[in-house]
Amino acid sequence: MSYFTREKHELTAATPWEKTVAKMLSPFNRFMNSANGSGILLVFLTIVALVFANTSCREWYERVLNQQLLVQMGSFKIDMTIHYWINDALMTLFFLMVGLEIKYEMKVGRLASLKRAVLPIFAALGGMIVPALIYFSFNSQGETVSGWGIPMATDIAFAIAILLLLKGKVSPSLTAVLVALAIVDDLGAVIVIAIFYTDNLAWSPLIAAFLCFAVLLLLNRGGIRALWAYIAIGSLMWVFMLFSGVHATVAGVLTALATPMNAVYSPTEFSTQARQLLDEFDAHPDSKTQVAHSRELNDLLQQLSTGIQKTQTPLQRLEHILNTPVYFLIVPLFVLFNAGVHVELNNLNALLHSPVLKGVFFGLVFGKLIGVVSAIMICVKLKIAALPADATFKQVLGIGMLAGIGFTMSIFVSELAFSGQAQHLAEAKITILAASLTAATLGYCWLRFITGAAKAETGTSVSQ
């Protein structure tokens, strides 16, 4: 049950003006709170970006992308285009969110125990290695070889959005495997970015960045749970990373890994003290009036708020703070300013014969499917791990198809792989969009229509 919602307020103390505003905002709030709202927004903005890049708006669109934005404090300055501010600065918050999800899964989620983690880890490894090899088979030499990391990633937001549309066609445990697989994929992508897509290293800023990381670890070890301290030092680490040659977004992941995941109070302690506070609140003579009329009531609420914060882990609080701005502002901005690719029909024949197109498309659509499904089958055959009892082999095939939705992370890697190579970058982006759409359509249709009657097969093993 949900508490403290706008709807409950409307039934009691809402003024006529509040009711009118609430009614106007209701569709917007429902969209923001829907599980697939972010995915719908990303699809819409992808279309908008493509329209901008292929109409008379193209000149304006590119001018905005290349607009310089200077941040200066004394002699220190960072001067980048809006495009790079989004990709190197704002996307650091996306990678911070990714890092928080990785740490959560490794601590208490599906990756917390080796027994539960084996299947998604092997599936993710298969889903990274096979697409990279397929890409390399088409691009074994020349300047396009650097794009091998593009088809390795899975866009978790889009994959989960497709599963939500299917409502019950996939077992919950297999859905959890896909989520864990995508998180391991993200971890792999971060490692690839940090190691293989790094410019010439500047050692002084890099050492300073890792000193910041060491300070964050010491804060964690010392029981410091103030989020502002981690954000401040993490921001400083981002600046050093930016000048070090390592991609600055790595600072987001490192900050996440150093964020504490232990609370001050246990649930039992919180429950006991919160009940005492609420009893005092109810017994107070001013409890029937507005809190603004009583300092004592306000003090009780402040104590309750402090208790709530100290019962939540800093990691959970930061993840909650970041969730809406990351998925409804930062990632949409990234898509809007990175998915706009100018398509020249005159060059369509050359595009279709491009080794980049072949490597990315076959890597995402077929490489992911082959890699994920083969890894799961090998694990089950060798009894390294068991297929979830409520899952079927047909569902595993569908999950393998959905893993080919690269989108956000693939576009991000393509920007690094083909920096300064406009033609190859355009080819990669067009192919990522086409391949992700193909993988999503195949996965959805397979799980919707082919596995529709497969519920009775629940419990069958992959060997069948």
Curated annotation (Swiss-Prot):
A GO CC term assigned to this protein in UniProt: plasma membrane
Residue spans crossing the bilayer: 37-57, 82-102, 118-138, 145-165, 176-196, 200-220, 226-246, 248-268, 321-341, 360-380, 396-416, 430-450
Protein keywords: Antiport, Cell inner membrane, Cell membrane, Ion transport, Membrane, Sodium, Sodium transport, Transmembrane, Transmembrane helix, Transport
Q: Which membrane topology describes this protein? A: Multi-pass membrane protein
Gene3D superfamilies for this protein: Na+/H+ antiporter like domain
Q: Which InterPro entries match?
A: Na/H_antiporter_dom_sf (IPR023171), NhaA (IPR004670)
Q: Which reaction does it catalyse?
A: Na(+)(in) + 2 H(+)(out) = Na(+)(out) + 2 H(+)(in)
GO: which molecular function terms? sodium:proton antiporter activity
UniProt record, GO biological process = regulation of pH
The highest taxon in the source lineage is: Bacteria
Q: Does the keyword Transferase apply?
A: no
Q: Name one Pfam family in it.
A: Na_H_antiport_1
Subcellular localization: Cell inner membrane
Cross-referenced PANTHER family = NA(+)_H(+) ANTIPORTER NHAA (PTHR30341:SF0), SODIUM ION/PROTON ANTIPORTER NHAA-RELATED (PTHR30341)
Q: Please report which protein family the annotation says this sequence is part of.
A: Belongs to the NhaA Na(+)/H(+) (TC 2.A.33) antiporter family.
Record's function text: Na(+)/H(+) antiporter that extrudes sodium in exchange for external protons.
Which HAMAP family does the record match to this protein? NhaA (MF_01844)
| Entry protein name | Na(+)/H(+) antiporter NhaA
Q: Which organism is it from?
A: Dichelobacter nodosus (strain VCS1703A)
Gene of this entry: nhaA
